[in-house]
Amino acid sequence: MLGASSSEEEDDDFQDDHESQLPIAQVKKRSLLSGAMTPRSSSPAPSDSVSQTNSLKRNNSSSQARRKDSVHSQTPARSPMKMNSPSPMPQARTMSNVTRPVLQNSQELDGEEIEETEGSGTMVASDDGGPSLSKEEQERIKAEKEEEEHKKNLQMYVFIARCVAYPFNGQQTGDMARRQMKVNKPELARIRERFAQFLRGETNIAADEAFTKAIQSYTEVFLKSERVQKVVHAGGFSQHDFREVFRLIIEKRVRSLPDIEGLSKDTVLNSWLAKFDAIIKGDETDQNRNARGRSRNPNSAMSADAVLGKEQLYDVFQQILGVKKFEHQIIFNSLQLDNPDEQAAAIRREFATREEALKDPMKMKRLTPKFVVKDMETLYMDEVRMSINTLIGNLETVPVTTRGQTVGKRKDKSRSRSIEDLSLFNSLKRRTSSGSLNKGDSDDGDVTLTKSDVSLALSMEVVVMEVQGLKSIQPNKIVYCVMDVDGHKLATDHAEASKPKWDTQGDFTTKTPLPTVKVKLYTEVKSLVSFDDKELGKIMITPTPNCSRNPEWYTMTLPKNSQDSSLKIRIAIRIEKPPNLKYSGHCWCIGRNSWKKWKKRFFCLVQVSQYAFAVCSFREKKADPTEFIQLDGFTIDYMPESDPELSAQGGKHFFTAIKEGDELKFATDDENERHLWVQALYRATGQAYKPVPPKQSTIAPKAQGFQDKASKHGMDALIQADSINFDHDHLYSDIQRLTLDFRINEPICSLGWFSPGQAFVLEEYSARYMVRGCFRHVTLLSNLLDKADDGLLIDPALIHYSFAFCASHVHGNRCMPDRQGPEGVGTVTLEEKEKFQEIKERLRVLLEKQITNFRYCFPFGRPEGALKGTLGLLERVLMKDVVSPVPPEEVRAVIRKCLEDAALVNYTRICNEAKIEQRMGNDVSPAQRIEDMIRVTEFCIDLLKENEEHHGEAFSWFSDLLSDHSEIFWSLYSVDLDSALEVQPHDSWDSFPLFQMLNDFLLSEPNLKGGIFHNKLVQQFQPLVVRYIDLMEHSIAQAIDKGFLKEKWESRKEGCATSEDIYWKMDALHTFVIDLNWPEEDFRKYLQTKMKTLTSDLISKVSDCTFTAFDSWMQKAKKSTDYMLPSEVCVQINVMFSSKSRAVRVTVDSGEYKYQSKLDETLETMLKTMESCIQEKLLGVLESVLSRLARYDEGNPIGAILNIAPKPASIFNKLKTMAGDTSVQSSSSTRQPLTAQQSSGQIGNSYVTFFHGCTELLRQVIIDEIWVNGLFEHWYDNQMKAINDWLTERLQQSLSATQFISLSNIVKKVYQDFAMQGIDEERLNSKTYQSISRRLQLEESNSHIQEGIRRLKT
């Protein structure tokens, strides 16, 4: 063993060389396992007790051999060809591959061992440099190694089976964290397929669009993630983890949604989770298939983490150690694992052997391991004494049980006891020798038992069944029996004398082991003279606890005047032995101090406690023993020859009990009885020597048959091996390693934690065989680190616990001084310290690697709390000792270095995923380079968001370092960004979306806003933004100059083609500046001012050009009714309104108020001018019409001529008359008045047509209805005013027919059209309109009067 030193190393090496060549049964490794033992705690680790002291007896190999063994003991792979093994068994074959064994300075591998650890080929060189081994020899050697490995596993199983059969150091707890089923690769594939089916709509699960999107996001981000696949391969994900990740994702999504009245967000979450469960579980077919698959697994999740019974524990460790069923059965029978008395006796014998080893100082000095400090040897002896005393105390707490009864719960040390029990318990911590193991206990003296300590309480069942030979009474008489035990009487049922049978059981309790059972047979007597029933017979029986339980016939004693010749009764007596009665029977005995006369007596072996036994002799009907002795210090053995003098008086088969100052001789009449007595007393004394029956013995006990069967299979040496001859530290290490391998392969997401049953057995093994606590934990750490190196996921809390225990032990800061040496300092072996230093370095490297790859070791923050635990463990590993905390700067420096490396790892993986390096050649276009960078940017942003969402809480104490990590990450990104921007053309603006994406993300992160990368990004894009705005300004200005020169003023949306193009560009530029969301306030204000100025200038130019064009078009207007308002003018008005709507953005803020700019005032003035101009041109047409009508005034010569002048129709009619067409003439004369009327209204009709066309054009083309309504209102008012003024000028004269007809038509149509255009009736029916209407009505009346007068005259 590493660190075991001796002053006789040469002799030790010589002896080891010979021992390595002996068969396994003959190898007696001189080791005594001992250690400081503490009560079992609730820790899920194999043990949380303070350090277990290691074996007193170590392998005496040389220093070099110990170094070699140390190397192999620290790695799962041990040298298969090594012969100088520290274990009594040959070395185990390689169980796992270790790629890089970490060697300390004192640990070196010679050439032979290096060759062995590097793997084997088909040809192996021999040790003497001879020819290579043949394939047959290799197979033979391999078979031998496997056989030796199997024997070693069998030997370990023997010790494990003893621990399972009789645990006394703790209980199996069921309050450990319940582990979930882990998701394996096939299960992950099935889950992915189920979610794909849901997204394809192939399931019957109803879902809305929001839930479908959530499932789609979950599938793309989580289920299809390569990181999740790796962790599933590492056995670190359960379905619970899958559900928790989904819950976290949807919680954030649902909480961000607006509240819906009547539907709480918790209800939505629960509904979504229920649907998620339905998807992940699949349909009934999938569930049944999974259930069948799991039922075929013997270690299913339903029972793996439950509290296991003994048979289940046996089965588990049979699988772990590769033990076959028949081998287990042989071990079970040979060790009598179902006999708690035998198991307790075996434990007492183990303790006795250890105590004997402690009595030899020279031997102890030679076998003491090498410590880091020489003075620890004395402390080591004290630790061993304390450990044994602790084990003895633990054994004392186990209640006394009978054979076949399961060992119950440990007795509570604080339970109520009698004064005798308390004094007995407190003084019986050392029972196997007269002297105390602890010097402080030597003053207690011998323990004296009283008769009350050995009192017994037996339960009896007496069943009277039937009577034969009853002939003295009539058949119809009633008979019954009375049972009497120590004065307690019970009667049977009544029966007829013809059928005297009963099935009545009497239950009695007695304190004497030899009770007297009296049974009397009575018949009922119905007589006035006699009041007592008649006794027909009686029997008195003295049963023993060993009597047969089968019914027996007894001959009853008859009364003197009985007429029956023979009366027999059938009785069954069953006596339940109390737990403290281990054996009883009749023996001949003689002793020096007790039982001084050779006489046959009834003896009972009574167990008072686990270490106190007494042999008592009892008489009939007596509850107290006549004499008794305490078996403490006696040695039981067979007597090969009978004592002639004593055998002449009685007894055939002798055995003795010898003690210093006393000797007892016993004899039995039956040889089997003697064997049973010897075995019972042998278990009670706890002696190391096992009595061997004399050769002339003809009895073949059952145990001998089991031993013969074990010998037949070559297992007798393993079963009979003394545990003290084994190095249990290394055996435990192997068991722990194999158990961990088995646990990792279970379908449970254990993360390295043992199941309750496995932890319980390992705890019991380490306690019973006193495995050093530090060695246990340091080997567990080594095994866990090996698993972590293999890519499996291990809970850092488990590593943290074991590491903290080892650190406290190695640094000498123990917190339990009562269990250790003075001031809590315990012994530390050189091997423990070297292994701890090695583990500490390995653990530091592993933790730094995990923190560097935290996204891949703990994806999506799973397992829960693992990353936070890793950071805490790293801080513990960096501590120099357990008292002085590590400086925060040192911890931060390590974490900073890890996060710096993490930035490189994360960005490199993103680049590999996006294949960015492969797309940086000259064959890739600049636009494609920007697209690639946008895709990489999306990956980077998603990555940092995931870091904050899933890992931010773990880094809460190092949030600034996580921010630095992000800055470094972006600095790596900026290299590729610069490369992509350098190849962009001078006039390309494709990179602005990239800037907007980055800037928006950085602004949303308080830790990155205004950081190094953000400032660099701003400085990099600021010149591009300025140049882009300048170019856009120049481009828009040129578009204004060139566009309006060629503008055709056709309607386009809100304006013309040129204005729409210009304003689209201006709006796009404005949106671009807003979307930039520039982070620097100064430049942001500059951009805002720049955009206001640019907008104002551009609008001014557009409005000026439009107004100029409007003026030119209006100058072409005519006053004739043939003139129609051009649509181009309406389009120009639309352009002005479009300009006005955009001019609203150009405002000047002054406190809480906003004032319109000069541009608004200018545009408003232009619109008013344009309205006035249009009205002026339209009114000019009306004025022209009124001027034409003025020519028809009365007294106006021109008007008279116009009134007399024939119309074209009348001239045509006259030509027809001249031709002689009288019919036509008469017809024309009848229609002439109507034709004249139409001719008179021609002027009015032409104006109405002009008016109607203009109103429809204005309403359809101009977009601002309010402005159009205002124009119509003013136009209407002006028209009515003009007509009214014209009529007012002619108040003194009547209107001609032409004037009347034209004005009536104009007024009527104008009123109707403006009413249809939406002008208020109140405005239409103005006073002016009413005045016009009255005048026209008056003129109409005058016209009718004059027409009537003309008709009268004619």
From Swiss-Prot:
Q: Which GO biological-process labels does this protein carry?
A: dense core granule exocytosis; exocytosis; protein transport; synaptic vesicle exocytosis
Compositionally biased region (Basic and acidic residues): 134-148
Q: Where is the composition biased (Polar residues)?
A: 52-64, 93-107
Question: What InterPro entries does UniProt report for this protein, alphabetically?
Answer: C2_dom, C2_domain_sf, CAPS, MUN_dom, Munc13_1, PH-like_dom_sf, PH_domain
> Which GO CC annotations does the UniProt entry carry?
cytoplasmic vesicle membrane; presynapse
Q: What is this protein called?
A: Calcium-dependent secretion activator
Biased composition of type Low complexity is found at 39-51
Top-level taxonomy: Eukaryota, Metazoa, Ecdysozoa, Nematoda, Chromadorea
Q: Where is this region: Disordered?
A: 1-148
What does the function comment of this entry state?
Calcium-binding protein involved in exocytosis of vesicles filled with neurotransmitters and neuropeptides. Probably acts upstream of fusion in the biogenesis or maintenance of mature secretory vesicles. May specifically mediate the Ca(2+)-dependent exocytosis of large dense-core vesicles (DCVs) and other dense-core vesicles. Specifically required to activate the neuronal G-alpha pathway. Functions with G-alpha proteins from the same motor neurons to regulate locomotion. Involved in regulating entry into quiescence triggered by satiety.
Q: Does the keyword Secreted apply?
A: no
Question: Which species?
Answer: Caenorhabditis briggsae
Keywords on record: Calcium, Cytoplasmic vesicle, Exocytosis, Lipid-binding, Membrane, Metal-binding, Protein transport, Synapse, Transport
